[in-house]
């Protein structure tokens, strides 16, 4: 292995200086420490898997030695791009089975970009194999999976960074530091969070033969087997509860995680939710098109709402959170934030926009991926990767540590469970049980399809 420093100057030039430096300081990063060339592998070479990997390549000395995907076309296409992008120009080894990949390679870092139903098994196996893990959110499809992932990270002493990169988003770091932490909001007692994107894939595609390039059996893995009705990539798999937790698990987890970070919140004291398929009744999708949830804390309610139809309440903030204080209001999204004081005595209005780095990283724009990367998320993901590496090198925990990712993910899963059983739920994380509710407790752990075995937090 060769040794070289993380290129601090190269990174700083690419960001708006003040916000970037503020972000680095807030995240506790030290980019001047030496760092080895990390041996990296990616499991899941689709849209966000490649996007995460390429952001890491942009800012740190890494060698991508292996790629794994059950879609032969996806992994071969990704290998070609990686060979063009990484410094060595080497083509990584290709695998259709991640377990074989872990057995045959000594890896420092494994990035997991697979669908939600595979996250837990792959992350735990990667940690057992000696790798640190960067896993996309939500971390799990059920609560006990998440508990097992946290237990594994602690047992094997591995850094696990969750892809909730809003904590590494420069303008949101600025909002936390200069609005929330500065006390400009006053006493905070209510938060609204929402998503009004028309993102619920639907339709009635016919059942069809599985193409030769796709191992659909392994793609399905521990999830229930659905009849094959076309490539599940990008958004089709997200429209089924067999593989995840719908818009609640996909989009609420980001906003709720950011709010918890900004307000220093832990587990909610009680969670409730209502919703269903109220409008988009045609098609195969079985996730909600309308849902509200309440995450309760002492003297504070955090309320979520999503609709995959109609118009957003605020067209400038279709996916966002609003923190209400007695001195002012903060409304924020991945694109911008606005602080609105209640009166002149409470300060002046403040507006900040997302930071782009298209000039420094033109490949962000030209990257031949489909769909295109989220340009607004690229600077945040680079910061997030640097924080991940800093935690590895210093032996600490990253800003989006697996335990924080578990709290945010599990809270959203518990909201879906509340909707299903029709009553509020109180989760005790020490006992890993819902208080006084045997019916709901039975939902904490999904049944796995044979021969897969559900991870046990007591036996990882």
Give the role of each language-model region.
Residues 2-132, 144-159:
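N-terminal glycine-/serine-/threonine-rich beta1-alpha1-beta2 phosphate-ribose binding loop
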Residues 28, 174, 184-187, 192, ...:
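Contiguous beta-strand/loop segments that form the cofactor/metal-binding neighborhood of enzyme cores
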Residues 83-85, 152-154, 178-181, 208-210:
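Short, hinge-like loop/turn segments at secondary-structure boundaries
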Residues 94, 119, 168-171, 381:
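Conserved donor sugar-nucleotide recognition element shared by glycan-biosynthetic enzymes
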Residues 137:
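Short basic (Lys/Arg) and small-residue
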Residues 142-144, 170:
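Conserved PLP phosphate-binding loop immediately N-terminal to the Schiff-base lysine helix
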Residues 148-166, 175, 189-191:
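Rossmann-fold dehydrogenase core element
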């Amino acid at each position: 292995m060769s040794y070289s420093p993380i290129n601090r100057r190269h990174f700083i030039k690419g960001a708006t200086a003040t916000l970037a430096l503020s972000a680095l300081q807030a995240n506790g990063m030290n980019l001047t420490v030496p760092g080895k060339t990390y041996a990296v592998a990616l499991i899941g070479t689709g849209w966000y898997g490649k996007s995460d990997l390429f952001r890491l390549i942009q800012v740190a000395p890494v060698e991508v030695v292996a790629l794994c995907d059950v879609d032969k076309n996806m992994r071969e296409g990704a290998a070609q791009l990686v060979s063009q992008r990484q410094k060595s120009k080497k083509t990584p080894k290709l695998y259709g089975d991640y377990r074989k990949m872990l057995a045959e390679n000594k890896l420092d870092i494994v990035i997991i970009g697979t669908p939600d139903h595979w996250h837990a098994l792959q992350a735990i196996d990667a940690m057992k194999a000696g790798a640190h893990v960067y896993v996309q959110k939500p971390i799990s499809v059920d609560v006990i999976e998440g508990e097992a992932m946290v237990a594994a990270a602690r047992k094997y002493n591995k850094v696990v960074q969750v892809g909730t990169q809003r904590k590494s988003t420069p303008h949101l770091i600025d909002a936390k530091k200069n609005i929330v932490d500065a006390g400009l909001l006053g006493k905070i007692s209510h938060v609204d969070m929402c998503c009004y994107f028309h993102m619920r894939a639907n339709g009635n595609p016919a059942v069809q033969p599985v193409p030769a390039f796709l191992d659909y059996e392994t793609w399905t893995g521990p999830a229930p087997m659905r009849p094959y009705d076309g490539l599940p990539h990008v958004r089709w798999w997200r429209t089924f509860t067999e593989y995840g937790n719908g818009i609640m698990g996909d989009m609420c987890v980001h906003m709720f995680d950011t709010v918890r970070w900004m307000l220093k919140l832990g587990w909610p004291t009680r969670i409730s939710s209502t919703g269903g398929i109220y409008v988009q009744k045609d098609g195969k999708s079985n996730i909600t098109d309308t849902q509200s949830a309440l995450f309760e804390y002492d003297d504070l309610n955090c309320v979520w709402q999503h609709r995959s139809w109609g118009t957003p309440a605020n067209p400038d903030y279709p996916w966002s959170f609003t923190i209400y204080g007695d001195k002012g209001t903060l409304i924020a999204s991945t694109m911008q934030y606005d602080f609105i004081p209640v009166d002149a005595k409470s300060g002046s209005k403040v507006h900040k926009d997302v930071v782009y780095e298209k000039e420094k990283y033109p490949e962000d724009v030209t990257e031949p991926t489909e769909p295109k990367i989220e340009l607004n998320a690229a600077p945040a993901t680079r910061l997030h990767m640097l924080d991940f590496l800093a935690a590895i090198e210093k032996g600490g925990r990253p800003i989006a540590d697996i335990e924080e990712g578990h709290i945010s993910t599990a809270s959203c899963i518990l909201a879906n469970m509340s909707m299903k059983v029709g009553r509020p739920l109180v989760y005790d994380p020490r006992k890993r049980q819902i208080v006084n509710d045997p019916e709901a407790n039975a939902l904490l752990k999904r049944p796995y399809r044979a021969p897969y075995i559900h991870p046990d937090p007591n036996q990882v």
